[in-house]
Amino acid sequence: MTEYTPMIKQYLEIKDKYQDAFLFFRLGDFYEMFFEDALNASQILEITLTGREGGTKEKIPMCGVPYHSASGYIDTLIEKGYKVAICEQVEDPKTTKGMVKREVVQLISPGTVMDERGLKAKENNYIASLYCYEGKEYGFAYSDLSTGELKSTVIEASEDRLINELTTLSTRELIVSSSEKEVLSDVMKEQLGLTFSVHEEDTIPVENEKLVTRHMSLSEKRAIGKLLHYLKETQKRDLGHLQQAVHYETSNYMKMDYYSKRNLELAESIRGKGRQGTLLWLLDNTQTAMGGRMLKQWIDRPLIDRKKIIDRQNDVSELMAHFFERLELVENLKNVYDLERLAGRVAYGNVNARDLIQLRNSLYQIPRIRATLLSMSSESLTELANQLDPCEELTEKLEEAIMDSAPISIREGGIIKDGYNSQLDTYRDASRNGKTWIAELERKERELTGIKTMKVGFNRVFGYYIEVTRANTHLLPEGRYERKQTLTNAERYITPELKEKEKLILDAEEKSMELEYQLFSEVREMVKDYIERLQKLAKSVSEIDCLQSFADISEKNHFIRPTLSEDGSLHVKQGRHPVVEKVMGAQSYVANDCVLDENREILLITGPNMSGKSTYMRQVALTAICAQVGCFVPAEEAILPIFDQIFTRIGAADDLIAGQSTFMVEMLEARNAIVHATKDSLILFDEIGRGTATYDGMALAQAIIEYIHENVHAKTLFSTHYHELTDLEKELSGLQNIHVSAVEENGKVVFLHKIKEGPADKSYGIHVAELAELPKSLIERASRILEQLENDDKKIIIASVKQPEEVHEEVQLSMFPVEPEKKASSKETKLLKEIASMNIMQMTPMDAMNKLYELQSKIH
């Protein structure tokens, strides 16, 4: 058996308890990693792998990072989904005989990050837990440890429902029992890209019982208990900033599944995976980090409560009507710090003096914000204003105690104001007077010795000294100057008087810094008493920030206040896609009407590719979402129903990880909509059935339309290239044909992007290919084939080098005819390769439009 050294034994004993984490093992000024941790970390962090003697024949793999710069390395590991266990020395090496005791003081995981550098200001960092009750329901709880938010609910024991909750929250980590983890599919684990943590204990810790209310179900309490136990065991510190668990019902909000949110690009773009080009990007003019986080929550969960929607609309109207007051509000909000996350750091003991200065400056703004809101006539804004707690006693205490110029470090003094503590003032006076005496000493010694270059200095190693150049040492009186340090060109001395004063000064400074740290710690502890009040204040300020953002964006983009219909009808005049309009510019964008009511439940949309069908469908959904989050909408007039759910199938979001084809995903999403939609839902289906054979696809598309019409009665926009389906208008009373218009000018197609009544009369597919600059010979051949297909009952035409009139009917399409007179140029070939490499199925209409402009610019 291998006999390791005592230190390696200690490492292995601790590592055994944290098998799923990198163990940062403190040795002096470094965090060291050994064995497999070292091998993996050296590659991930790109740091040098070395070895250390550990009692074995060969050196043990080792790598390390300096403790003072470890946070950057920790952030890298966390961002990649790993966990890091911080193991510190918990005994003083100077007073300990033998091996210094070490313990893990914190486990940092993707869901438990508290360091500001590892968090995104306008994004929550959620950790969730799951409790499966008899296979029937899931108790579900989640928290943002950095803000103290804690919420819970009960959902159906369905993987789809669970995925919807997890993706809505952008959850970073999920806590499950070992048996629950086994039940969840591997596909789900890979798709979600979150960290799974196994934890069995699920009873509420005694000290946290006050966070749970009695009316919560057993499964909900168990989910909360599992979450709290995990946080308690991994954080190993006070979690007093966690708020009382708030129960929420998913039925109180508009439901959208993961694919619908992705297709509509609410908070993340399909192509760039960022905020740019999303609805959140457009609507976000929040001035505070916490306001930005609340705005995302609002967009993720639109309201279905009519009164709450109207209240928000009233607030936005009021803010729009008071332009100058709104400007003043914005200026005040700019100076409000992230109160939510500050409260979390106070609980953790991580705040510094600068944080407290920012807290004080934030609290200064609250009376001003309150006064501005009270000057308006909105009842709900008045209610919000009255909820603003300026925490006057805290503001006064911070004003009295903390210097405006306080440093970040809390151990080096310069934090507490003069006059705050009499003993501190005494120490400071002693230090200042001593330094004045030393400055005077330098003048006296120069006069006494006649050495004009003599100076009195100080360093941390030797303390105070008198420095004389070598050339002048002979001028010093004998017996009074004691040599302290020899330099290349000078000698440093000390005198009895200087030695005595040095002790007084250094003692005073040491005591001053010790007392100052103690006083700062007392102030920091005092702030803990205000955590709950600060969290409530943060919530009110965040809501105000979101409302002013809606007002600002609505005004700048010419949005109007929508009316909520009572009969479920939708009437939008000159509606626009808010994001596309922003990117293209209002002058370039073509607005369109949309009407859906009991006589027009289904709009069947035909028209060529690139004409704007998908954009039109998306704009209807985004208009509804804007209305139900309480914002104004991009239109000239709008009467909108309150939708309980939105389902979309737009574009080809192939589920490659699950091994499902485009068509299978299409059918699964269609089923999801058909089974769960109600008469109050909105369904957007873009070219359903295109992933299979023509007649199969057409048959399925027709059957789906008929089923929605006869059984579901949801408001539906259904785009298709199956022109035959337009005949359904004669059979289905609630279906209306509309099309995106286009015209031919000089043999070229011009897309008007205008929605008109009735079916499209032509496809223009070949014209789209021509716009993409496909070779001329290819376009001409396609035109001849199309002409024959249209004239010959759509039979397949064999390729031939003969003229069209000499071609006979065949059932197999062969090679294109050879046209020696015209070969593709190198420029055409290059463009063809670029077009061929494009992943069209992953492009949004806006992406495709931008790419087309880019290709055109290369030609011209």
Swiss-Prot record:
Gene3D superfamilies in the cross-refs: 1.10.1420.10, DNA repair protein MutS, domain I (3.40.1170.10), MutS, connector domain (3.30.420.110), P-loop containing nucleotide triphosphate hydrolases (3.40.50.300)
CC terms in the record's Gene Ontology section: cytosol
PROSITE patterns per the UniProt record, alphabetical: DNA_MISMATCH_REPAIR_2
Recorded superkingdom: Bacteria
Residues reported to bind ATP: G607, P608, N609, M610, S611, G612, K613, S614
Keywords: ATP-binding, DNA damage, DNA repair, DNA-binding, Nucleotide-binding
SMART domains reported for this sequence: MUTSac, MUTSd
InterPro entries: DNA_mismatch_repair_MutS (IPR005748), DNA_mismatch_repair_MutS-lik_N (IPR007695), DNA_mismatch_repair_MutS/MSH (IPR017261), DNA_mismatch_repair_MutS_C (IPR000432), DNA_mismatch_repair_MutS_clamp (IPR007861), DNA_mismatch_repair_MutS_core (IPR007696), DNA_mismatch_repair_MutS_N (IPR016151), DNA_mismatch_repair_MutS_sf (IPR036187)
UniProt-recorded Gene Ontology molecular function terms: ATP binding; ATP-dependent DNA damage sensor activity; damaged DNA binding; mismatched DNA binding
Annotated NCBIfam families: mutS1, PRK05399.1
Similarity remark: Belongs to the DNA mismatch repair MutS family.
PANTHER family: DNA MISMATCH REPAIR PROTEIN MSH1, MITOCHONDRIAL, DNA MISMATCH REPAIR PROTEIN MUTS FAMILY MEMBER
HAMAP family: MutS
Functional summary from the UniProt entry: This protein is involved in the repair of mismatches in DNA. It is possible that it carries out the mismatch recognition step. This protein has a weak ATPase activity.
Protein name: DNA mismatch repair protein MutS
Annotated organism of origin: Listeria monocytogenes serotype 4b (strain CLIP80459)
Lineage: Bacteria, Bacillati, Bacillota, Bacilli, Bacillales
